[in-house]
């Protein structure tokens, strides 16, 4: 597992359904107790995103970010629904820069995932972001976005 690679996080959601969520590895070989973990960015889905087709990520969100500048990530906005598509490449901002100043509503999600729960794929098509594993950190995760997610879950 290397920085900049796209993997799938495989897990079972609270409705006992199998999920495969594409993630971008930003730091590997993180140890939590005895189990190896990887720090990843969630590849989210969006529809009709007004953001530019270039994703800006704060440099302090990554370890040695220059190593993954040709990687791709997905973004979504607070008004997003389940549909989305791949955008990128990644640009890195100065440490501590708040990405909402670049694009209103743009958010990213970071989390730590056990390596054994991740499967390698050569490329990652866009998947639904309606179900998120517990424990994701989401910048700009507003009450409006949470309400949208709850509505989507109720509809399904």
Where in this protein do the model-derived segments appear?
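Compact nucleic-acid interaction/catalytic patches
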Residues: 8, 17-20, 25-61
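C-terminal terminal-subdomain/extension
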Residues: 62-156
